[in-house]
Curated annotation (Swiss-Prot):
Pfam families, alphabetized: ADH_N, ADH_zinc_N_2
EC nos: 1.3.1.-
Annotated organism of origin: Arabidopsis thaliana
Phenotype on disruption: No visible phenotype under normal conditions, but enhanced susceptibility to methyl viologen.
Lineage, opening ranks: Eukaryota, Viridiplantae, Streptophyta, Embryophyta, Tracheophyta
Stated name of the protein: NADPH-dependent alkenal/one oxidoreductase, chloroplastic
Assigned keywords, A-Z: Chloroplast, NAD, Oxidoreductase, Plastid, Transit peptide
Gene giving rise to this polypeptide: AOR
Length: 386
């Protein structure tokens, strides 16, 4: 999930291919004629704004009491999951002699307590972004929750002992960190971090950063506001589950509809969906209502554009764009987490952690295998990390 927004106007459709980039297009139509196969859009104007984005029920509870002290002796070496070649899950190796990263003046060193996996982790490991990736070998992982054990000289607000969470790579695909969160320690810039919400544990916190930043930025870029309606495709996924909650409980949506499989309909209702749609039985193109925004978190943009109102907007998590559309790379920003912390602490927004987890640190390869089935509910979390 990533983003680099650009603004353009044209009368041809935006098409997409599979990619973890987040896309945004504003569709304004005088006559809503949408026949994707024939590329006939009536009178259609598509806008893609340019800007960097930030790129997500209850979990099996991890203990909130974590015995980490700020003045603990920091070892020279640590355990970490590493891959030295691109490929399948089998390239992942648990190493015990990885050097603990040195911090820069604007960074803190975090003793990692929990981490989470995202689809972009798998695609990166498969080599789909090798042109812009950091050099191998790689310690994967974007999402982290843990305790600050060392601070750089230019760090202003954080101190040793603070419990924090973040997406550790400012840009998920453009030179992401070589040493990510699937390790005992990781170095993170202060600007990417926020204090962990007090009411959730580390495992729950680890499941939030990349997904909730993606969800929020999509809503911001579509100018979503009180009184508007939204349809979320894949409402039980890591990002979709948070889009439902933010739209309903933070932005004041007049109506939230969401698709899910039969067994997950009650979950999306519990998160705030007014209408839960069983995608195994219903076709969204046949829905009687149109929506101000469609948030496509599954890769069905061709159908998404058929259920928006005149002037409505679509956010797509998968697919690339042919001109005049533009991809935009989601970037991490601790300010987004700080903005949303009050809603998390009030219980209005809840982390959704897949019930098959958390996976212990020794089973990271199994966690990836499960993630790549594309059947996870919410986020796949790794906890505890020794």
């Amino acid at each position: 999930m990533n983003a680099a927004l650009a603004t353009t106007t044209a009368t041809t459709p935006v098409l997409r291919r599979e990619t973890p980039l987040l896309h945004y297009c504003s569709l304004t139509t005088k006559s809503p004629v949408y026949q994707i196969n024939r590329v006939r859009f009536g009178s259609c104007v598509q806008t893609v704004s340019k800007k960097f984005l930030k790129i997500s029920a209850s979990s099996q509870s991890a203990s909130a009491a974590v015995n980490v002290t700020a003045d603990a002796s920091i070892p020279k070496e640590m355990k970490a999951w590493v891959y030295s070649d691109y490929g399948g899950v089998d390239v992942l190796k648990l190493e015990s002699n990885i050097v603990v990263p040195e911090i820069k003046e604007d960074q803190v060193l975090i003793k990692v307590v929990a981490a989470a996996l995202n689809p972009v982790d798998a695609k990166r490991r498969q080599g789909k972004f090798k042109a812009t990736d950091s050099p191998l070998p790689t310690v994967p992982g974007y999402d982290v929750a843990g305790v600050v054990v060392k601070v750089g000289s230019a760090v202003k607000d954080l101190k040793e002992g603070d419990e924090v969470y973040a997406n550790v790579s400012e840009k998920a695909l453009e030179g992401p960190k070589q040493f990510g969160s699937l390790a005992e320690y990781t170095a993170v810039e202060e600007k990417l971090l926020a204090l962990k919400p007090k009411n959730i544990d580390f495992a729950q916190a680890a499941g939030l950063p990349l997904a909730i930043e993606t969800a929020d930025e999509g809503l911001v870029r579509t100018e979503f506001s009180a009184g508007k309606s939204i349809l979320v495709l894949n409402g039980a996924g890591g990002v979709g589950s948070l889009v439902i909650q933010l739209a309903k409980h933070v932005y004041g949506a007049s109506k939230v509809a969401a698709t899910a499989s039969t067994e997950k309909l009650e979950l999306v209702r519990s998160l705030g969906a007014d209408l839960a749609i069983d995608y195994t039985k219903e076709n969204i193109e046949d829905l009687p209502d149109k929506y101000d925004v469609v948030f496509d978190a599954i890769g069905m943009c061709d159908k998404a554009v058929k259920v928006i109102k005149e002037g409505g907007k679509v956010v797509a998590l998968t697919g690339a764009v042919t001109p005049p559309g533009f991809r935009f790379v989601v970037t991490s920003n601790g300010d987004v987490l700080k903005k949303l912390n009050p809603y998390i602490e009030s219980g209005k927004v809840k982390p959704v952690v897949d019930p098959k987890g958390p996976f212990p640190f020794s089973r990271v390869a199994d966690a990836f295998s499960y993630l790549e089935t594309n059947h996870a509910t919410g986020k796949v979390v790794v906890y505890p990390i020794p």
